[in-house]
Amino acid sequence: MRILMLAHRIPYPPHTGDKIRAYQVARHLARGHELTLGFVIDDASDRAGLEALRRDIPDLEWGGLWKPTALARGLAGLAMGGSLSIAYFRSGRLARRVSRRLRDRAYDAVYISSSPMVEYVRGTTLPVVMDFVDVDSDKWAQYASKQRPPLSWVYRLEGRRLRRFEAEAVRWGHRCILATAAEEKLLKSFAPWARTAVIPNGVDLAGYGPPADGPTIIFTGAMDYFPNVDAVQHFCADVFPAVARAVPSARFLIVGLNPSPAVRKLGETPGVTVTGAVRDVQPYYRQSSVCVAPLRIARGIQNKILQSMALGVPVVATSAAARGLECRPGEHFLVEDDPARLAEAVVGLLRDGAARTALATRARAFVEGHHSWAAVLERVEAIVMEAAGEHPARSAPNRVSVSAAGSKAGATRP
């Protein structure tokens, strides 16, 4: 089967949640089918991953963006009645290449990873499977609640515009995949016509070991991503001081690429270390006794929680971070929102090795049973094959005009 897959960023290296899922899906589909993977590169350093990615997926198409220009285009799109996100990820180069591929090659199905990429195939007669993962429009609404005007106005407006786009896009998609039942319910609240499927994120089950004995706490993630920045600022200001008073030798590791200036500033706090980008997070997990996910803004499944559970590090999370998970608080992880109670939960685990081991063991069993990549990817592949099987005329090349992703008409007004 011939599949065209489009991702909003190069899924390599797979070190953030969206890239991990896209990379796993692309690699799996490329093993059993003829896969063309198209994506946008908006960070020049990401080009270093092209050759490594090509070893897994030989057939690549990509278009580059310069962030300042893309942001200006996004804001202009918002001002003209469209979505900032859709306009931001519009690459003329990628649009032309996708159009040529659809014109010259007989694909059986299209797989979209992230909603902005829908614009590149608008008008195709091929079946389109849309893996939205999360409802991004609601994320913008959450951002707005944490900002002051005028930024809050921009975020709130983008949330409304993107929601309008999402509702229209799912009208002609064969199936829309969400990572959690909560995200599915949210999408159907404003797009009841959507044909949906819930497929959770998977996790790499290699590298499991007992939690460390030292008083080290870890948080991982892309540290220029606003929800992560807000989470570690909240933890350092409102939670870690109480932990450090109870356990003076406690350390807090903030592990992840592109730390913002605000995050780097946290590294000046006694007991707090900001690593920046690392080649492999597993060594940092192996020296950690507890993983925290103190997010106040969160969508879908937090990969950082699944990864910690898979590696045998017990987790303390907020209810926002835990919302997309089917595991049970108290049995597989601890959930607290009040800063004082969150600190107590962390301190309790730091002091009680038996409790750490018991919680980690139950959590590992849960992810083995519910989040293995093998099971997740089989379900994704089945939906793509079902879509191709229902398509009545997939033998002839399709035609999608370049304007589908590049013109003023239709590009930002679904």
Residue positions per predicted region:
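Short hydrophobic beta-strand element within catalytic cores of glycosyltransferases
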Residues: 304-307, 314-318
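N-terminal subdomain of nucleotide-sugar transferases
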Residues: 1-61, 103-105, 406, 413-414
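Acidic donor-binding loop of glycosyltransferase active sites
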Residues: 174, 271, 286-300, 311-314
